[in-house]
Amino acid sequence: MLSKARLEAFSDGVFAIAITLLVLTIAPPTDYRDLGSQLWDRWPAVAAYVVSFAVIGIMWVNHHAVFSTVERINRPFVYLNMALLLTVVFVPYPTGVFGEALSRDEGARVAAVVYSVTMTINACAWSAMWLYASSGRRLLTDEFPEERRRAATLAFTSGGLIYASSIGVALINAFACLAFHAQIGRAHV
């Protein structure tokens, strides 16, 4: 069985790769004759990159917080962590689609829905991992206070609902959806 330290190191590597891949979602201009205008037209892609960079960064910090409360790991927890990492490393793809759609002003609402669904699935993966670890204090350290466990459980389980509500925002306005995701991230800092 993997050690907790090895799982943390692997997870850190996945987070690092995902956050690095985000920059590749911003396509360079294809026409350099009017470079200023071309760069200005890319601002929505840069905004999507910044929001996703912050979101993945917050996820990484939260991952470390969760692992500081976990005393031991077991096989089901490892697989739940892998499911979470699957959603994390996928974030650059919908970020690129979302940023490009916003920049082109084509298909932006559909792209916003895809981004929001991705974040909702990610939030559900967080919930599953936390609920498994904390249920009956299965994997938690004895030092972790019960009131903090309850607060964390509420935060993790409400995350899926909050992100799911962003799907509704996406159907109305893609730029509002991006702002909504920025605010969700800000609330988790």
Label every model-predicted segment.
Residues 187-189:
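Conserved small/polar residues in nucleotide/adenosyl-binding loops
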Residues 26-31, 54-69, 89-103:
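Membrane-helix exit/interface motif
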Residues 114-137, 159:
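Alpha-helical transmembrane segments of helical membrane proteins, especially in multi-pass transport
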Residues 40-52, 107-125:
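Alpha-helical transmembrane segments
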